[in-house]
Amino acid sequence: MNQVKMVLIFAILLFLSCVNVSAQVIKGRVTDSTTNEALSYAAVEIRSFEDDVYIGGSSTNEKGEFEFHLKGRYPKIRITVSFLGYKTIQKVYAPATEYSYLKFEMQEDSQTLNEVVVKGLSPAEKVQRLAYNVSLVETAKLKSTTMDLSNVIDKISGVKIRSTGGVGSEANVTLNGFSGRHVKIFIDGVPMDGMSSAFGLNNIPVGLAKRVEVYKGVVPIELGGDALGGAINIVTDNSRCTRVNASYSFGSFNTHKTNVYAEHTTKKGFYVSLNAYQNYSDNDYKVNIDSYTKFNEDGSNQEVKENLTVRRFHAKYHNEVAILKIGIVDKTFADRLLLGFMGGYEYKQTQNASTMDWVYGARYTTANTLMPQLTYEKRFKVLKGLHVSLNGNYNFGKSYSADTASCNYNWLGQSQPKGVPGELSYMKYRYRDHNGAANFRMALFPADGQSVSLSSTLTTFSRSGKDETAYKPTYEHPSQSMKIVTGLSYKYDYKGKWNTSAFVKHYMNHLEAYLDPEGGINYQDFSNTTSYWGGGWASTYFWGRHTQLRLSYEYALRLPTSRELFGSGDDIERGNSNLKPESSNNVNISVTANAVDLTDHRLTIDAAFQYREIKDYIRRTTNNDSGRASSQNDGRVRNLGTDLSIRYTFKDAFFVGGNFSYIDMRSLTRYVTGTQQESKNYKERVPAIPYMSVSYTHLRAHE
């Protein structure tokens, strides 16, 4: 392993030494076209010409001068200069050298003297002006860090990420009371369902993303998944420039993390990018236990109740991932046409079951990922501004779960022989988890301020395999599922002052498996297809220059995931093919207030309220006799929540913010199923859900 690390570090250094990326410097001066006097504090904004990506914004100094240092190279840029009482100027410029000096002569415009001049919006600001309750983080200042996406998302108000262990463990996202599979994760609008933990939020480096969008509650149809409790969309970085970022870190428990990102776009529109990262850790940190199994010399054992601090001894994890994309941009037939390939390997030792009462010392799993990808985008200048996009991938992955030890382990790292092999269940299970996802979107703009959008998302899952230790019919017969979620929406925007969207969604779920529908051993081919309708609306109103109000409602559904239906594959989590979809009435109210343009200071306050009432809530349970987990429908649940976020920025050089969230999630199932006996959980809080959180964030320019 040490040799592999040294080779990897050497390869990174060699790669960086062979790449020369120069920054472009853009300087300029803004003057009055009549008097030639300098115009101080004029707003200057730079965007890439090809994809309208926001690059930077500033204002002129007392001499009317501005200066930008562009990170990377851009074939063409669009510069916009605006100033109160003058006509806005836009120039498209192709920097021919590393240094450019531009002059802007502005003409007076008496019609704008009494109007408000609004600067061009960055992509982040455009998303935040939507009618949906959305929080957004841009990652430009974090590219060269070793942070992962979970570190970034965890700082957003109303969001809490809890990990089940160290490096490689599952990241459980809690969003306004909803957690786990109730919160959908997307990459460029494509669901991440079925991907291994190598592509989990706590393993993906922040450099992979351009920004992260967190939708709290109602989710737009463009994210065509069955999200009930909200959604997180990771927007990858596909800007047209040449750059390289690399990072390496090491830490406690022999933890090593490496990330390399490089991309290049030629003048003829050929694009190539490579993102490679690895994570390794022994994960041998200490944990607190209140009991353990004592092994006696005569072969007997006994449960000892004692509070101890012990070190984990079987939790090693490592993964290696490479993502290559090649294609063309800015052609007559495609704005972007990219073919991608994602390859990865993962090794994970299993220290304990779903609870810490069951300890393992030899179980492990491996997973290989081979995933081709396709991206296509085109904005048509005719046909009423038609915009079409397609994103898809398919994973030809293979996994292996091994449980062969003929002994039991305790938290002291001691072992005791047993008569039969298998710590939980004897297995050498080789299986194929093939999952695919595709998202098609089309938008049409028939008139100013109006748009019609269509989105359809397909996700498929297929598992088949063989256990080398014994014939198990449910393993060798394929288990398959297919979901199609289609949405249609209409949006109306009234002069940028008020906009509203109405949408309808259709959900289809098809399931095939070899099982006993009653949970016994009378196996048979089982097939079931269901379909449902949902819909809602979202509206936002801008009150004055600095206040935005949002109100939205949705009748939403969440279809059971492949893991909830078929299990995890390693026998730690059992499937339940009888699960029914969850349905919910969602209401969201939020307000955003900005105190801006106060010299060099900016203060932003976000406050939101959410109401959910869920039917057939899917809850994860654990069997105390085996440590296995499974899912079941649990009647009705009501959730009330609120969150508050306050952020202060000084000159774009210093940022500090605080977040507070509170939720009240309670069971409304009055009677025990099939009886008239009142449930002891009626109107009680749903267990294992954090109901209050407080966090803060600060960032200085050099960070």
Model-derived regions: residue spans:
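Extracytoplasmic beta-strand/coil segments of soluble accessory domains associated
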Residues: V134, S150-P191
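Periplasmic-side early beta-strands and strand-to-turn transitions of outer-membrane beta-barrels
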Residues: S249, T266-M356
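Membrane-embedded beta-barrel scaffold of Gram-negative outer-membrane proteins
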Residues: F542, R550-E554, E582-L640
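Short, acidic, small-residue-rich periplasmic hinge/interaction motif at the N-terminus
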Residues: T31-T35, A42-R47, T80-K87, E98-K141
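Transmembrane beta-strands of outer-membrane beta-barrel pores
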Residues: F250-S252, Q278-D282, D330, G343-Y347, ...
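A beta-strand signature from Gram-negative outer-membrane beta-barrel systems
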Residues: F104, I156, V206-N245
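Short acidic/polar hinge/loop motifs at secondary-structure boundaries
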Residues: E67-H69, V190-K216
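Gram-negative outer-membrane beta-barrel transporters
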Residues: T604-E613, Q632-R700
